[in-house]
């Protein structure tokens, strides 16, 4: 498998938050990588605008390339096995990468993970 790197967007088998025995292949943004797992943002491919303070629209979604306006959801950051990654879609623009990291840090502060 190709190396998986932060800032990349991959198609991966992502478990549902409500029932982790169920999953869906969906785009994810890679935040961090270690030997066996990757921390990823869930990315809902939707034409709807973000509705939570912990969601952000990707401005350069077409350059990745994705088919639709896409929203990154900070409350759904999880670690998933590299074996769940299917194929590389592309890479976030530097502006979107900065926005995603800022969103992630704001979310972590809100739940007391960082101060």
Model-derived regions, located:
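Compact nucleic-acid interaction/catalytic patches
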Residues: 18-25, 30-63
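C-terminal terminal-subdomain/extension
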Residues: 61-115
């Amino acid at each position: 498998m190709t190396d998986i790197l932060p800032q990349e967007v991959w198609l991966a088998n992502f478990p549902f938050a409500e029932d982790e025995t169920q999953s869906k292949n969906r785009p994810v943004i890679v935040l961090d990588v270690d030997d066996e797992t990757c921390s990823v943002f869930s990315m809902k491919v939707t034409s709807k605008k973000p509705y939570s303070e912990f969601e952000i629209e990707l401005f350069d979604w077409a350059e990745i390339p994705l088919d639709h306006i896409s929203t990154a959801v900070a409350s759904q950051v999880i670690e998933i096995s590299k074996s769940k990654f299917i194929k590389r879609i592309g890479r976030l623009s530097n502006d979107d990468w900065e926005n995603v990291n800022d969103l992630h840090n704001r979310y972590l502060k809100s739940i007391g993970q960082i101060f």
